[in-house]
Amino acid sequence: MATDQLIHDLYAEIVKIPLIDPHSHIDPHRPTARTLDDILGYHYYTELAHSAGMDKALLADAPPRERVRSLLAHMDRFDNTVQYGWFLEIARTFLGFTGERLSAADADALWDAAERVFARPDWESEVMRRSNLEKVFLTNDFDDPLTKFDTSRYVPCLRTDDLVFRLDDPQVRQRLARATGEEGRDQVSLQRAVRRLFEHFTAHGAKACAISLPPDFVPSASGPGVFWMLAEHCREFNLPFDLMIGVNRCVYRNGVTQGQDLFDQRTSLIQYAELFNAFPEVTFCVSVLTSAQNQELASYSWIFPNVVTSGHWWYSNIPAYIEQDARARLQAVPKTKQLGYYSDMYKLEFGLPKYNMYRRVLAKVLADDFVRAGAMTEGGAVELARLLLRDNARRIFRV
Amino acid sequence: MATDQLIHDLYAEIVKIPLIDPHSHIDPHRPTARTLDDILGYHYYTELAHSAGMDKALLADAPPRERVRSLLAHMDRFDNTVQYGWFLEIARTFLGFTGERLSAADADALWDAAERVFARPDWESEVMRRSNLEKVFLTNDFDDPLTKFDTSRYVPCLRTDDLVFRLDDPQVRQRLARATGEEGRDQVSLQRAVRRLFEHFTAHGAKACAISLPPDFVPSASGPGVFWMLAEHCREFNLPFDLMIGVNRCVYRNGVTQGQDLFDQRTSLIQYAELFNAFPEVTFCVSVLTSAQNQELASYSWIFPNVVTSGHWWYSNIPAYIEQDARARLQAVPKTKQLGYYSDMYKLEFGLPKYNMYRRVLAKVLADDFVRAGAMTEGGAVELARLLLRDNARRIFRV
Amino acid sequence: MATDQLIHDLYAEIVKIPLIDPHSHIDPHRPTARTLDDILGYHYYTELAHSAGMDKALLADAPPRERVRSLLAHMDRFDNTVQYGWFLEIARTFLGFTGERLSAADADALWDAAERVFARPDWESEVMRRSNLEKVFLTNDFDDPLTKFDTSRYVPCLRTDDLVFRLDDPQVRQRLARATGEEGRDQVSLQRAVRRLFEHFTAHGAKACAISLPPDFVPSASGPGVFWMLAEHCREFNLPFDLMIGVNRCVYRNGVTQGQDLFDQRTSLIQYAELFNAFPEVTFCVSVLTSAQNQELASYSWIFPNVVTSGHWWYSNIPAYIEQDARARLQAVPKTKQLGYYSDMYKLEFGLPKYNMYRRVLAKVLADDFVRAGAMTEGGAVELARLLLRDNARRIFRV
């Protein structure tokens, strides 16, 4: 940073923008970590440690404090990764860590610091404030009661993977019946069930519907598809539909929890052309998994009024791909149609390092491609960042 | 620019190279804009404005002056894009605009300036001179009479999409019959028709045959394909064949005119292996739509003597992709086999900003990858640029 | 280099790391060039010259000294390429060339210098020393006797393309029968043959099994596949399995020798999911041909403990793709699971310029993404480079 004053200055302004985080997995009843294990239990650490040779038994069966020590002991195998960088930033910013590198020798001090810090009565608000997070979208199961949390801070979002891909599962049927009074065994019952879910969610402040989709998924109006029905209800209930396109579940069958999913690069947004044409009133906030498909996303969003670029997802959420993908979007997609970033986090503490990673890349792209190229003033670049990090989300999701 | 002296110096030399523009949609009888509506009617502006929320009615039915005002009013939604940058450069260079950003408030002044400037008797020559354009290739319908224009300045090129993809259309049949005296209903008649078209075009100075192709197109020697017949005539008549690979037409069905086409990234040049093998005497000037397929293009051009890289097309025609794609080509493809850029323009005024965009990227790549890396002198880098912008086109198209 | 002190300093340290080169085509009985024709006969030069218009007859039938002169005469058509850069570096470093550019006028002087230099009795050791090469892996035919060379310097590797793809060829059958006493006409005989090959190779110091695979290959446990059998023997004999994924053979049918192969970008590592799951004990060192598939590779290696990233192969072995691909791997894949580079060379003289190309890119990425970003000290960055260039290969291949 220090080597480039313009990037430094832009970054300093960008971090002041209060964030609307349009996609996370936060549990609003337990939004922050309680122990260091809640931090290092994040699948990025368990899967990287396992991938680098750590035995699954050490990960699964150990008591939390020992699991953390083992993870720290394995970190020297993946301390090159950005995910390690996120944790280092958490340790430094929130836990007072002052060393250069983390190792098993830091386990006790970090554990104790975490216990102390995370137990503060105002910890949740402090994390929000220090991370400059204003609103955080959730990912709620369809049968979530959505009660007992502040929906102006934690914005509900109807996650629909179970409805589209697991409705054959008796447990899912039962959950649907309990939530809606409908078993959804025929089109009429299914229609009624979905309608009740949308009524329930919008009554409780939901601002989006969301789903993750495998690479070979092709939405279609023909056949008894739940997916198409969801799009119809998004239209009726005025909800944007988050499409997270491209993930194959359980590719590595013996992987750690949440560390089993991968993808097939051979997928195309052309599979969604019929959908985008059929629902001009629905805003589709699209995430893709690969940088190659990002070129499709930038192009489809440049052409379709109802297609919006959304964040930098999972395997594309590293600076090498964020930089290339964000550059293309900023050069080709109307600035009002870009949701710059979302955290995808499970615990609030990750908002800060993840957004900082994005904001550093964004400052660099704005400096190189816009301010230095003479296309924008510094002030103009910061206003553009404000759209990406805040104002577009407010307008698109009506929050 | 100013921040990097070497890039600045290279750019200053590169802009002095007189351009051969090997692909445009210029109407030689009306090559320049007559009103500002001819500029802002370019599909890049109508599609971006529509994508950013502008009603199609405002675009289709409004009187030209009002349409321009509406477009300018919507520009603050896409003033981050390079296409906005092209227009800003036109306004500054040709229309005397001196402000920072364009808005509806500039509509009258720009309209009047355009009316005044575009009406100058020497405007066509002035644009050519100030843009440093020497020759501009056209894209002519097969039944274009090719008369009453200077074919040494505007080089005819036989566009063959209609013949390959729309020969079932009675109107196309009629046009073919009128142009050639043949209806093309059997192989013999079709052969005669195609031969007459090639005779007509080459007699009128045509220097290339061109076509755009969908992602799933696979040329084949078997079956009664017009495409294969065209390649045979390119061989016989000594014409390079421009292949623009990868576009799906009318994906966004309700899009504005020319703002409906997109693509499927899942396409490969392996589909053209049989063609490239069958016609070693024909030079294929290949454009691709995606940066991922650019790696295929660079590799196929590195191996096949008759495959030449051509320009940066459409959704790849933004600096983020031009830079990566040009770098790969410059590092891997013989320098004599690269057509650096073409304008794809409908009005001459766009030559300047589009080529400037390319020349800025080219200066940067030459500075970073060649001059600073010690692989070339500044003079050598400028000579390389001269091949890309001028000399390769002259040799390959024999102009 | 000189323009950036940090990159310069990192590079200076990185070149001191003794190299383990995990993949080459060196003939251990004739590891160095004997004439300049051995250098310029490398397919990169013959295919680029041919692609740029050089007649195959000049390449195939000419006496060596004339062929070299002709190649040099054509070099001004591809002196922009990195491959030209490798040769220029060889000429300067080993042959005393002091000029700016190479041409036919240099043919005699270079030929004579090469004759003199390559004939030195200690030339092989001198090249190894000046290139800082410690061990070089070979690519041995399955019936290679593996005798009369120093297997601690030249590490045998069982190349299995013939077994998997050409077992129907009577010549291959015969070679198999001679090498193993088995014709491999049924599963039992084939099992025995493969076992004997593994016994022979491991007894002679082989440290890997390797194969190159077409884009549509899908390994499967069902059916009488030799490939699956090889993986089983890798498990039993404790050998890593190098998978070089994505090449189509003989795409350009009239190309020069080894200058005929290309690829289809439409391939995915999902095709290997069953394999990776079935053999957790086998380390798969995976090379891919495209930068788009590199994102898959980085992701699969991040998740699967037994998938390791390996080098920058063929059409991806140019700085534009090395930089992007290496950045992604360094940000996302545990550092212990990356084989940074291999030479793929046929003559030892190419180790120096090829590794230097990689080391320059690596120094730049380490400077920009790690040291300047504050994520690593300079010393830490050099230690990371040591893993990529040496220590990971030693651990993974047990050398």
What is each model feature region?
Chain A
Residues 148, 158-171, 253-277:
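Extended hydrophobic/aromatic segments used for targeting, binding, or gating
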Residues 276-292:
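Electropositive, surface-exposed helix/loop patches at the edges of structured domains
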